[in-house]
Swiss-Prot record:
Ranges of Low complexity composition bias in the record: 428-437, 978-1008
Species of the source: Dictyostelium discoideum
Name this polypeptide is given: Probable serine/threonine-protein kinase irlB
A GO term for molecular function: protein serine kinase activity
Annotated keywords: ATP-binding, Coiled coil, Kinase, Nucleotide-binding, Serine/threonine-protein kinase, Transferase
Transmembrane stretches, start-end: none
Pfam families: Pkinase, Ribonuc_2-5A
UniProt feature, compositional bias: Acidic residues: 412-423
Reaction(s) catalysed by this chain's protein: L-seryl-[protein] + ATP = O-phospho-L-seryl-[protein] + ADP + H(+); L-threonyl-[protein] + ATP = O-phospho-L-threonyl-[protein] + ADP + H(+)
UniProt-listed InterPro entries: IRE1/2-like (IPR045133), KEN_dom (IPR010513), KEN_sf (IPR038357), Kinase-like_dom_sf (IPR011009), Prot_kinase_dom (IPR000719)
Domain Protein kinase span(s) in chain numbering: 1027-1293
CDD domains xrefs: RNase_Ire1_like
Domain KEN intervals: 1296-1448
Length: 1448
């Protein structure tokens, strides 16, 4: 603290004296250092604000500006500015104290005042965020009242709050108790002598300290502080305001008794002690006080008491000053003081109505008001009722009452005129002033009387009691005021005022209906309601009588009105005739309710025969019949008057009216009027009902419109927020996917490079091996050819010998007979001898040279081989022949190699096709583990062998053809042998299978015989089984067991044993299930028979081979699918058909899981070596089914495997068919992913994921059809799940034919001319995905499909179709065209390759074989095409008929 104060002193060198003065001045006031420090800091901040420039036009002052100017200069601001701001927030009272001191400094001159207001205004602008609202109001009010009441030592009380008075008075009290000597001097001596106590002058001039003393009613402190200086008496009225405000009894009594005396002449209280010098001199001379500042008017003091209902001060005035009652005037109002400076006239006018002070909102107690008014009534002081200050003479002339005078104290009685024929009211007061007046004064009175008659019409409206009733003042205050006005409980039997002259009739009715019972009893039972003779046609009693029969009054209120009319029966007769009362009774209640503020009566003269009451005109003529008899018949024959007391009162009035000889009325006229009134009432009620209905409708329509607008606005806002969130999420997902794709592409490129390198190495190794093999084959061929040539040479030599002999014999004959032909032949062809000679002349090494010169690889030559020109073969010819043969053999081997390569390629295509088909069977999820087919490309080469046949003169072409035929025969023979071997093996296998089946049947029979012959054998009815553990097939919930057994000693069955105690509804359910089995559903387990004993029920079921769970866990699911010759989707249909069968009979399985899906292996077929395998549904949950409805029988949680039941089952809600749909979705996922679960493979967390709806379908991303279907099936909201029929109609389960039809329908939608308006939308939708704006195809589809072969034009087609490869629409056209014209395309491709003499693409020809193969090809290239088209065309299915069937 000291260091902080030192910093303040250093920073405030310019005003160091002020700081020290403030510290000295607050030693006793603030004994705590913390308060001392806070006040000093606040004063320093205010002084700093005085340095800021102030401009009235511009507000440049703020905390930021304050920091800029002083933050760098002041040390304490640099360190502790945050702490000072917290001080401003927390120390509210200290802030008020310092600011108040700042306002009350002794400044002379207006300039300094304006400067102070500007400094405070700167302080408010700088620190307004850290000040409370009370302090801000405090400052604003101080600035606004500064000019007007700055010089007043005691300010009006309205500027300060009560809490500040208490706290400042407590601080003042603490300061006095710190020093006993000071306290004694103040209380005992009343004189200040010590100069050290200079701080008390602060409280002398401070109004807050004086207010605290008056509030605590401390008379000694009050007098000692007030009498120090004579200047304190300048505002004596303000002091009395404070005394009356707090009702300080001790201060008022001491002040009045000791220091004031009554001046009877001037009716004032004069101060009699410690007067000023001038006052003492005047008082000694005249013995009267002429100083107005030292006196107060009694009427003014009385008004102070009435403002705040100061009952204690009023008692003192009445009791201590006996002449006070006779000296005060009669015109005392409850409207309070008309302040000259601070109060608003409107607030002054209504202060008594709101019962609160002007600024403090301090509620005055109701009892205090009542006691104060009763005090005046007991002391015979009554309040005037006027607000417009009408002269007393007007009241005297109008009401004939006495008015108390200000100047006269005597009491004389005068007689006054009567205001009623029967009652006389007198007053016991005189007015001597009126007796002493001259004639001139009487003339003035007459003139005033005439002028004031005009104002009297508005007098009732402005009267005090009428305003109190209008603003719903407390009833106790009103009753006390009424009793004062009529001088009740004053010891006077006569009335002074009449209530009907003070309140209007309608206001009286309102007050009687609104006020409580005490007010009504006072008004009615005390005969406060009366009417003067001047208005004999008043409507008050008529209205009372009308409301007696209405529904507005309660049962408690009616007796008061009955009592009133019993006391005053003459009022009814003197006002209106009795028949008119009954007529108006029928209609007045509704009219009064609707037109409460309208005039109830309009009249002109007193004696008029026609008077208008509530819309009725009474123009009745005298008749001979007595109207009283007519009224009596009306009472007896009508149900108008249901109240018996009312009937009695009416009869009393009738009897009373007989004596008065009232007018007569006909009975028929009265009945007609009664009927008319009833009709009018009904019509009015109907009109009111219609109006109300119209109003209600309008209000409802407006409310509905508003609600719709609000809902739309909320929806728009939510949609915008959701869109923004989705866009953000999409951007993030795109970035992540883009990164993933980049990483995947990099990895793929690396893997591709590695694979290419491996393939290159393998190809190099294969080429080397192939070259080695070729070389070996060529070497073998050379050796064989050499051997054959040797053999041929030998044969030639032998043949030459024979030829020589023959030639010798023939030479002679030929020469002789054919000389000329021989010559010609010799020219063309050498003779055989010459050939032989040439052949002999050639060396034998020529053959070897020619053989060695043969190239290892011979190119193919033409089929035309040069024939020998002579029938005689020479060695050269034989060599040529051999060479030709070798060439032919090499050509054939090359052709064989090419054929083998084509066969290998064809086989590879078939293998790929099988893989594609298998992938399609598996739903497109990778290659299953059971597909592993390998082909060896290396084929064994066939060797060339030639038989040693005799030489002939046949051409070489014939030899080659024979050689080819022989090879083909050999190949055919070898193929036949292979086929025979295969058939023999198949027959052997079939025989083995039959033997195995027989053996299996024998084994089963042996096993069953073993079961029967065991010691634990059980026979119940037709069932026979053994209870050993080896014969238990499974265990279930509630003590259920399944055994192997026999039914009727022949048929093997599974016997299910269930306990009756745990399953009370078995019989009902079993009958229903047996009835289902009679309907022959192949996908359901058959219930064969039922037996019972005392404890158990036994069911005979179909004996199956295993369950889906066993297949997956053992890894045999792939073998099961292969052997069934079905796809996995087709096998899943078996389960769906079974559930469809159950749901069609209103049965819910409620416990579907892989353990309850059983496998049934059928018989194998000889042709395909495949079996008719299938899935069947078992365990229909006997404790959970109900046949009568589509709901399951109980709401208990099933006891099957966890993770296959939806959210509503876990919450124990009633279960519907959607439960089975959820389980089917999980089972489909289980099948397609080979054992995975959509909610996690960990069984512990599956239920948690189901509740939170956290599913993981990423393993199915490659198959979007399955992904979308399963996602809808396993959704948390059961209303979103599809039915079993919708599941079967999903594209996932479509066959190829339906898919082709769907593509045709899609193409028709695109081609329709009527759809041209949204064709552009269709193209955009087809090119992009639903979830985001990403394109469906990342690349143009001509890069994904072999388009060049499929675009071959057919024969005779002149127009070629053009396609846009970046649009899905043209892809659909392309697929449809290829499916429709696949045969023509295939022929065109074959012809094109025949013309070009090249080999066609066998893959293209393979998938062009049928429409199904074409669709499979396209699905393998673009897997999710059908799913994409299905999703994009969904919105058009409702409007287009040919699309509707695909979606429903």
């Amino acid at each position: 603290m000291n260091s902080l104060l030192n910093n303040l002193i250093i920073d405030y060198e310019y005003d160091l004296i002020k700081v020290h003065h403030h510290i000295q001045k607050n030693i006793f006031i603030f004994p705590f250092k913390k308060q001392h420090y806070h006040s000093t800091v606040l004063e320093c901040l205010i002084n700093l604000c005085s340095k800021l420039k102030y401009d009235e036009n511009e507000n440049l002052n703020s905390l930021d500006q304050f920091k800029i100017i002083f933050y760098n200069e002041s040390k304490f601001l640099n360190k502790n500015l945050k702490e000072y701001l917290e001080i401003l927030k927390n120390s509210k009272e200290i802030n008020k104290h310092v600011i108040c001191d700042y306002f009350e400094k002794d400044n002379n001159g207006s300039e300094e005042k304006n400067q102070n207001s500007s400094i405070v205004f700167n302080f408010l602008n700088c620190f307004k965020d850290y000040l409370s609202m009370d302090i801000i109001e405090f400052i604003v009010r101080g600035i606004s009242f500064q000019v007007r009441s700055y010089c007043n030592l005691i300010k009006p009380i309205e500027q300060w709050k009560q809490k500040t008075y208490q706290q400042r008075y407590q601080q003042f009290k603490k300061a006095l108790h710190l020093n006993n000597e000071v306290y004694k001097r103040i209380v005992c001596n009343g004189v200040w002598k010590s100069e050290k106590l200079d701080y008390i002058y602060r409280y002398k001039s401070d109004q807050l300290s004086l207010v605290g003393i008056i509030e605590s009613d401390c008379s000694d402190l009050f007098i000692s502080t007030l009498l120090i200086d004579s200047n304190s008496y300048e505002q004596l009225e303000n002091v009395w305001r404070l005394i009356c405000n707090f009702d300080s009894f001790s201060i008022a009594s001491k002040f009045l008794i000791e220091f004031f005396k009554l001046d009877k002449v001037n009716n004032k209280l004069n101060f009699s002690i410690h007067p000023s010098s001038d006052a003492n001199e005047n008082y000694k001379r005249t013995k009267t006080s002429t100083n107005s500042n030292l006196s107060i008017d009694l009427v003014r003091l009385l008004e102070f008491t009435t403002t705040n209902f100061s009952i204690n001060v009023a008692k003192l005035l009445i009791s201590k000053f006996p002449t006070f009652i006779t000296s005060i005037p009669s015109r005392n109002s409850l409207w309070g003081i008309e302040s000259r400076s601070s109060l608003n006239p409107i607030e002054n006018h209504f202060r008594i109505l709101n019962c609160s002070f002007d600024f403090n909102n301090h509620q005055i107690p109701i009892d205090k008001q009542k006691d104060y008014i009763n005090l005046f009534t007991k002391n015979l002081i009554h309040f005037n009722t006027e607000i417009n200050e009408i002269e007393d003479l007007i009241l005297k002339e109008r009401y004939h009452i006495s008015i108390r005078s200000i100047n006269n104290n005597n009491h004389d009685d005068d007689d006054y005129d009567d205001y009623d024929d029967d009652d006389d009211h007198h007053s016991g007061c005189n007015n001597n002033n009126n007796n002493n007046n001259d004639g001139d004064h009487n003339e003035d009175e007459n003139s005033i009387k005439e002028e004031s008659l005009i104002e009297f019409s508005n007098y009732k409206v402005d009267s005090m009691i009428s305003r109190l009733l209008k603003y719903n003042a407390p009833s106790t205050t009103i009753i006390a005021l009424l009793s004062n006005l009529v001088c009740n409980h004053m010891g006077v039997s006569q009335r002074i005022l009449i209530l009907s002259t003070l309140i209007e009739e309608i206001q009286m009715i309102e007050s009687l209906l609104v006020q409580n019972d005490s007010f009504k009893t006072f008004m009615l039972c005390e005969s406060m309601v009366s009417t003067p003779n001047r208005w004999s046609k008043q409507s008050i009693p008529l209205v009372f009588f009308a409301y007696i029969g209405s529904d507005i009054l309660n049962l408690k209120e009616r007796p008061m009105f009955y009592k009133f009319f019993d006391l005053n029966p003459r009022l009814l007769l003197s006002i209106i005739p009795v028949p008119l009362i009954f007529k108006t009774f029928l209609s007045c209640s509704d009219i009064i309710r609707n037109n409460f503020e309208d005039d109830l009566i309009n009249f002109e003269d007193d004696d008029s025969s026609s008077v208008n009451f509530f819309g009725f005109t009474s123009n009745f003529s005298n008749s001979d019949q007595d109207y009283l008899s007519a009224l009596e018949t009306c009472f007896e024959n009508s149900n108008v008057f249901n109240d018996q007391q009312l009937k009695q009162m009416a009869r009393k009035l009738l009897t009373f009216s007989k004596r008065e000889n009232q007018s007569r009325i006909a009975e028929s006229e009265l009945l007609e009027e009664l009927e008319l009134e009833e009709k009018r009432k009904k019509q009015k009620q109907q009109e009111k009902i219609k109006k109300r209905l119209k109003r209600e409708k309008r209000l409802k329509e407006k409310q509905d419109l508003l609600l719709i607008k609000l809902e739309k606005q909320k929806e728009k806002q939510l949609e915008e927020q959701m869109k923004k969130r989705e866009k953000k999420l999409q951007k993030l997902e795109r970035k992540r996917l883009y990164k993933k794709l980049q990483d995947d592409e990099k990895q793929k490129l690396i893997e591709k490079q590695k694979q290419k390198e491996k393939e290159k190495e393998l190809s190099k190794q294969k080429e080397k091996e192939f070259e080695l093999l070729k070389q070996k084959e060529i070497d073998e061929i050379k050796q064989k050819s050499i051997q054959e040539i040797d053999e041929i040479n030998k044969n030639i030599q032998q043949n030459q010998l024979k030829i020589d002999e023959i030639n010798k014999k023939l030479e002679i004959k030929e020469i002789q007979n054919f000389q000329l032909p021989l010559l010609n032949q010799q020219q063309q062809q050498p003779p055989p001898l010459q050939l032989l000679k040439q052949q002999q002349q050639q060396p034998s090494s020529s053959l070897t040279i020619q053989l060695e010169s043969i190239t290892p690889i011979l190119e193919p030559k033409n089929d035309n081989v040069v024939l020998l020109k002579s029938s005689i073969e020479t060695p050269i010819d034989s060599v040529k022949k051999i060479q030709s043969i070798i060439e032919i053999q090499l050509e054939e081997e090359n052709q064989k190699k090419k054929e083998m390569e084509t066969i290998d390629e064809y086989e590879e295509i078939n293998i790929n096709k099988k893989q594609i088909n298998s992938n399609m069977k598996w739903g497109g999820i990778g290659e299953p583990s059971w597909i592993s087919v390998k082909k060896d490309n290396k084929k064994s080469k066939s060797t060339i062998t030639t038989s040693t046949t005799p030489t002939t003169t046949t051409p070489a072409k014939v030899i080659t053809s024979q050689f080819k035929n022989e090879q083909t025969k050999k190949l055919i023979i070898e193929n036949n042998k292979k086929q025979n071997l295969i058939n023999d093996n198949n027959n052997n296998n079939n025989n083995n299978n039959n033997n195995n089946n027989n053996n299996n049947n024998n084994n089963n029979n042996n096993k069953l015989n073993n079961i029967i012959q065991d010691e634990d054998f059980v026979s119940i009815g037709k069932f026979k089984f053994n209870r050993n553990e080896s014969n238990i097939l499974g265990r279930g919930s509630n003590g259920t067991l399944v055994f192997k057994g026999l039914w009727s000693d022949k048929i093997p069955v599974a016997i299910k044993q269930m306990q009756k105690a745990f399953n009370p509804l078995i019989n009902k359910e079993v009958e229903a299930l047996i009835s289902l089995t009679s309907k022959n559903c192949s996908n359901m387990i058959r219930y064969i028979d039922k037996e019972e004993d005392k404890l158990h029920v036994y069911l005979g079921l179909t004996l199956c081979d295993g369950s889906l769970q066993n297949l997956v866990e053992s890894g045999k699911l792939n073998d099961f699918v292969i052997s069934s010759n079905k796809s996995i989707i087709e096998l899943a249909k078996d389960i769906l058909f079974g559930i469809q069968f159950l749901h069609s009979h209103d049965i819910v399985h409620n416990d579907l899981n892989p353990r309850n899906i059983l496998t049934l292996i059928g018989k194998t077929s000889n042709n395909n070596n495949s079996s008719n395998n299938s899935f069947i549904i078992s365990d229909l949950g006997l404790s959970k089914m109900e046949v009568e409805s589509s709901y399951s029988f109980t709401s208990n949680i099933p006891t099957g495997q966890g993770g296959y039941h939806p959210f509503e089952v876990l919450q124990s809600k009633r279960m519907t068919k959607s439960v089975d749909i959820f389980s089917l979705g999980c089972i489909l996922f289980y099948l397609l992913t080979n054992g995975q679960h959509p909610f996690g493979n960990d069984k512990l967390f599956r239920i948690v994921n189901i509740i939170s709806n956290k599913m993981n379908l990423t393993p199915l991303n490659s198959n979007q059809l399955a992904c979308t279907l399963i996602k809808s099936m396993i959704s948390k909201d059961e209303s979103i799940r599809p039915t079993i029929q919708n599941v079967l109609n999903h594209p996932l389960f479509w066959n190829l034919e339906k898919k082709i039809q769907f593509i045709d329908a899609a193409l028709n939608l695109i081609k329709e001319p009527s759809n041209s308006s949204y064709n552009s939308k269709l193209t955009k939708q087809l090119n992009h995905c639903d979830d985001n704006d990403e394109p469906f195809l990342n690349d143009s589809w001509n890069h994904l499909i072999d388009v060049t072969n499929l675009l071959t034009p057919t024969k005779g087609s002149k127009i070629t179709i053009s396609y846009q490869y970046d649009k899905v629409r043209d892809l659909i056209r392309f697929i449809r065209n290829t499916i429709a014209h696949h045969k023509e395309i295939k022929r065109a491709i074959i012809q094109q390759f025949q013309n070009q003499q090249s080999r066609p693409n066998l893959e293209v020809l393979e998938y062009l074989s049928s429409q199904d193969s074409i669709l499979l090809y396209f699905e393998s290239k673009i897997p999710n095409l059908i799913h994409h088209i299905y999703q994009q065309l969904k919105q058009y299915s409702l409007t287009i008929d040919y699309l509707f069937n695909f979606y429903n």
